[in-house]
From Swiss-Prot:
This is Propanediol utilization protein PduV. InterPro entries: EutP_PduV, P-loop_NTPase. The lineage of its organism: Bacteria, Pseudomonadati, Pseudomonadota, Gammaproteobacteria, Enterobacterales. May play a role in the spatial distribution of the bacterial microcompartment (BMC) dedicated to 1,2-PD degradation, perhaps being involved in cytoskeleton dynamics; might bind GTP. This subunit is directly targeted to the BMC. GO terms for biological process: biogenic amine metabolic process; propanediol catabolic process. It comes from Citrobacter freundii.
Length: 150
């Protein structure tokens, strides 16, 4: 499986998604620093929310195969600027988390924010209901993902 780096604001579900990907029981755990594993790089939301920490995200992106921009379906606004992932020089996917909490119109808006930020493919997930994760696994386990062939 490709190593995926999860970037998103605080409380958007990055760590829950990581726990779900590892088959662990879901429990709240505040990520205080970048957490490295063989298949994931989990980043604290503060690294996105504080521009002074962008350099840590850029440096860590070098160790990832794919960048995942994570945003909860009920997010009031996008923390990602258009073209946010350009300097990372990695394929980018978008992950809409907590998809069970929002209307289809709201999910569509969040999807458009992720695409503007650089996501080439967007997945809709719910760690609570364990939906959308299988599609993401299939994509990550593919020998050559479609967004890698641009």
């Amino acid at each position: 499986m490709k190593r995926i780096m999860l970037i998103g604001p605080s409380q958007c579900g990055k760590t829950s998604l990581t726990q779900c990907m590892r088959g662990e029981a879901l429990h709240y755990q505040k990520t205080q620093a970048i957490v490295w594993s063989p298949t994931t790089i989990d980043t604290p939301g503060e690294y996105l929310e504080n521009r002074c920490l962008y350099s840590a995200l850029l440096a860590s992106a070098c160790e990832a195969d794919i960048i995942a921009l994570v945003l909860n379906a009920d997010a009031p606004w996008s923390p990602f600027s258009p073209g946010f992932t350009g300097p990372m020089n990695r394929p980018v996917i978008g992950l809409v988390t907590k998809a069970d909490l929002a209307s289809p119109q709201r999910i569509s808006l969040v999807e458009s924010w992720l695409v503007q930020a650089g996501a080439q493919k967007v997945f809709f997930t719910s760690a609570l209901e364990n939906t959308g994760v299988d599609e993401m696994f299939i994509f990550l386990n593919a020998k050559e993902s479609s967004c890698l062939t641009k």
